[in-house]
């Protein structure tokens, strides 16, 4: 299965001990699928930078270690012209920040890929679009059920 995860999902992988983080089990389920090879991650070019910015701000004492761990996770990058064009179209259509629409554009431009997000604001705007799934719905998606 091919997934794109945005920073709202990926940062949860590093905040496992936080009691205020919701949907932790779902986020770790995605990470487990990546580790076993059941899930192939395809990401936009700013993925590491965006996640790293949150790690540096929220957990500076562990940020360097967490960055190394993030870089150890296997994923490929999509940064071709079609991705940027689709992201621009989505940003205008949804009146939303391009950095968020880049994740969705990668999913839309990669055959069979789905964006998984914990960003409720983006999900509310993009729910009419194809190939976007809430983190809550990801477990059903990964298991082959309909989210």
Predicted regions span which residues?
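A general alpha-helix detector
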Residues: 10, 50-54, 69, 86
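Short, well-structured N-terminal submotif of metal-dependent ribonuclease cores
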Residues: 1-43, 55-65, 129-130, 141-145
